[in-house]
Amino acid sequence: MGSMRIKAEETELPPEKRVGDGSISLRGKPSDKSKSGTWRAASFLYVIVFVNSLVLVAIQGNLITYTVNILHLDLATGANLTNYIAGSSMVATIIFGFIADAYILPFWVIAASCIVYAGGLIGLVLSVSLPHLIPPQCDEAVCPPASQHIQSVFMAGLFISGMGAAGIKPTVLSLGRQQFDDTDPVEKKKGILFFSYYYAVYEAALFLATTVFFWLQTDVGFKEGYSTMAGTFYAGIIISLFGIRYLRHQKPVGSPLTILAKVIVAATRNWRKPLPADGSDLYELEGETSDIQLNRIRKITHSERLKFLDKAAVLPGDAKGLPSDKKQQLIREWKLCTVTQVEVLKVVLLLFPNWLCSCFMYVAAAQNVTFGVQQVSGMNRQLGDFTFPPATVMSASIFSSLLWIAVYEYVLLRPLKKWTGHPRGLSPQVRTGLGLFFAAATMGASALVEMRRVSVIRAHNITDLQVKRGLIPMSAAWVLPELILMGFCHPLLGTAMLELYHQEFPENMVSLSMALTLVVRHLVDLSRLVLSMQPNGSLVMAAPKAG
C-alpha cells in the first residue's frame, strides 16, 4: 500500500503544469497545460463543426427541392416542413445545452449526438435509395403527393438527424472555448479568435454544401448526394476521435436555471426589506469564487442595475454576526443568494433585448433560405452550358461572409483597435447594430427584385408550370446584391453574439448561452410559416395573376 501511495504522488501533476481554470481530462484528472487544449484540440472540434454544418445545410437547404419535386408536396407544405424540422432541431439545443451545463460533460453530449446523427443519416439514405420509398416521377403542374408511409420514413430520418445536430451545435462551441485558459493572457488572446474561426469553418461548410452537394442532389441524384454526405460525416467523426486526448473539460456545476429561480424567489420573499446604502453589505462568499456547491464560479461585481433584485442578497438582522451555518440554511431555504447569483440573473435579463432584436436579422436570412431559393428556381440559371441548382445561389452569400471575416480579421481589425481601443475593434453591441442595418438593406433589395420578377411574369403572361420549369426571362444574377448584403450580416451578428454571451454569462451557463445564440435564428420559423401562407394555402411564389 505504501509503494502504491508513493507512485500516485510521483505521477500526480504538479500545480505549475495544471491549467489555471481547473480544467480536467476525460478521466477526471487535472489537464496538463503543455499537452492539452489551445488550437491543437480546437482543430479537431472544427472538424466536427465542418461535417455537422455541411450535412445539415446540404439536407435542409435543399429540402424544399426534394419535397416539391420528388415527394410532390405543394410548395407551402414543403416550406412548412423545412420550418418545422429546423425549428424543432434548434429549440432542442436549449435542452442539450442545459444538460451539458448542469449534469454531464459537453463531450458526452457530443458523442451521444453523433451516434444519433449517424442513425438519422442511415434512415435518410435508405429513404432516397430504396425504390418502394420513392414515389413515381411526375412532370405535371399538379402531381399526387407521396403516400403517408413514404413521407413518414423520410421525416423520421430528418427528425432524428436534426436532433443529433441539435446536441452537437451548442456543446461543441462551449467545449471549443474551454480549450483556452482565460486565466492565461496568451491563451485568452488566442481564445478570442475561436468564434471568428468557427464562423469561417461554418461558412466554408455552407459553401461546399450549397455548391458541390446541392449539385450532386439536383443533377446526379439524391441517392448519390445523401450517400456522399453520410460518408463525409462518418469520415469527419473518425478524424475527430484522434483529438480526444488533447481536450480539456470543465466539471458540470449544477442547474443554472435553479440559481435564477432562487434569486427570483429570494427577492420576492425579501421585498419588504430595505436595501443597504452600501452594496458591499450585500451577501457574498469570501474568496475569488462564488459558487455554493463547487466553488468554481468567478465572482461578479455588484452593479446598480435592476436594484430590486438585490433584495435577494439582503441579510436579515446583524449581517456581521450571523453564523455561517445560518447563512447556509437561508440559502438552502431559498431566502438568500450571493451577489454573484443576483448579477447572473441581471445579465440574463439585460441581454434579453439584444437576443430578441437579433431575430430581425434572421427574418431576412429565413427569406433567403426558402423564398429566395424558390424565387431563383423560376429564373434563368444558365452559366454557359451549365445550369446550376436553385439552392446553389446561396453560395454568393456564403462567399460574402468568408470575405468579410478575412477582411475584418486581417485588414480592418488593427486600425479599428487603435481607433476604438476595443480588443476586437468594434464592440459586440456595435457589430450587432451593423448586422441589423445590413439585414434591413437586404430586405429592401429583396423587395425590389420581387417587384421586378412579378412585372416580368405579368408582362410575358407566364403560367405556374412555366415558373416551375424555370422559364422566367430574368437572370438569377438579380438576387446577388441581397445575397452579398446578407453575407455581411451573419459574421457581424453571429460572432458578436457568441463573444458577448461567452463574456457575460457565468461558467455554469456556457453551453446554454451558446444554445441561445443558435435558437434565436429559428424563432423566425413560426413567423416565416405564417407569412408564407396565403388564404388559398400556397406560398407567394406562383405566377401572379394578370390584371
What are these regions (language model features)?
Residues 2-136, 144-547:
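Hydrophobic transmembrane alpha-helices of multi-pass solute transporters/permeases
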